[in-house]
């Protein structure tokens, strides 16, 4: 068989060489007529099978068939060979594609609904993170700064370990303990410590995990959670962010049928607790004021344990725990760090230690020094240093006098916090400089004198600008806003005005956060008085601060000039300047002599050859 082009194939048909054609798809086979072939005995006729054949690939058309008829060529059309396997696959392939696409989306939807399995029928299963007995490694020794809360929870641990001691005498352990406190204070850590100390299974779930798109899922998950816990009792169920499902049902505006069904099921399950099973429910929230009263009644959450921000002693203990895994230099004073981190939670302090370790690595040191911790505190409190920010010299002078005014007012105003640091290095998004004040001790109440002293310190930045330059700038915008808020609260919240003495003009919530309510319960005349009284007090305090800084103008100019040269003045240097207030010239001479003495050895060294 010889393969030829289709055009040549047609030419051989036209010449009469091809006398028979078999039409396939898409090929053509042409057979020639049998003709004699030479042999040893002469000529012999070739059979049709032995006759030359031609093979071509082309397209069957009406003109080609007409040509075959005209040439009286015998032709036949060979039926197409059918491959049943391929045909079956061609029919089934689209169906298989649709099936796999449907299965993919069905599994994804079922997974989103249930969070556990690939079946939509598992949507009602609880999405709790169960930790087996003995696998919770957290202990009370890992928790610091909340000693009172630990004492309350130690009783829960004792019940889980020795339940008969309580049941034999007829006592009942609280069925539920609600941990209340601001974010980051260690509520979840305390719950894990209880489970770790008692060596019992620990079931942890978030309040938002109960609510999904299908009605009834929340109640089903509550039932499943308590069923799992009872099977492994004694144990602890911990619900984080309880306010997600426990909001009060009294507010019809924010009512939600699915959330109410979930809450009702939770109340039923808590009523069904058996005091002898050793199953205790712990929950945490930072919004106890929005919880439903039925949830807080005795027999459900019997105890509310306040987990507040730590005091000075607690902050030091927390820092020591987090510093156990960090290489600290011997001279690091964690108590000093605790003193400047007033109001920090346990999570904030952990972040400070971690940031200090990262700063030490960035600087190429093998240990964390005190400077790293100070920088970490300022970074978490104010923001990152912006050393690359370009500030005009005129603006730097305004900032220097502004911050010096804050520092002097904080020093010479009775009741103000002491100055820890002054700097004109920008930080964060808006701080072009700042004066770091720290209280001597933690405060739980604030006197009227201390509030007015804080107002004086806030207004002293603008007052310093006025004393130094005779005009003010927008740099004191945030200070004025904060001072206005303090004075307004003194009048409306604390009853510290002459006309409305001992009268609170605003209502506050009754919960832990005591959020102010938006409703105003006083007249327009009272509002006018409040506005006028705020303006009067601020004007009076501003005049007093201007008088103070005018009296201390020489000291103001000296510290501001020093601040422009060095950019940062620490507490020790600032206090030395204050002590030498009446001998600034002598202080200048001593400082210049110290600088000359420090530079003399460097000048006496011979240059390297």
From Swiss-Prot:
CDD domains, A to Z: RecA-like_FtsH
Sequence positions that bind ATP: 181-188
GO molecular function per UniProt: ATP binding; ATP hydrolysis activity; ATP-dependent peptidase activity; metalloendopeptidase activity; zinc ion binding
Keywords, ordered alphabetically: ATP-binding, Cell inner membrane, Cell membrane, Hydrolase, Membrane, Metal-binding, Metalloprotease, Nucleotide-binding, Protease, Transmembrane, Transmembrane helix, Zinc
EC top class, as a word: hydrolase
SMART domains: AAA
EC number, UniProt record: 3.4.24.-
Topology versus the membrane: Single-pass membrane protein
Residues that, per the record, bind Zn(2+): 402, 406, 479
Periplasmic compartment spans: 1-83
Gene Ontology annotations of biological process type: protein catabolic process; proteolysis
A Pfam cross-reference name: Peptidase_M41
Cofactor or coenzyme needed: Zn(2+)
Record field: compositional bias (Polar residues): 592-609
Active site: 403
Subunit structure: Homohexamer.
HAMAP family: FtsH
Recorded family membership: In the central section; belongs to the AAA ATPase family.
NCBIfam families, per database record: FtsH_fam
Name of the protein: ATP-dependent zinc metalloprotease FtsH
Organism: Treponema pallidum (strain Nichols)
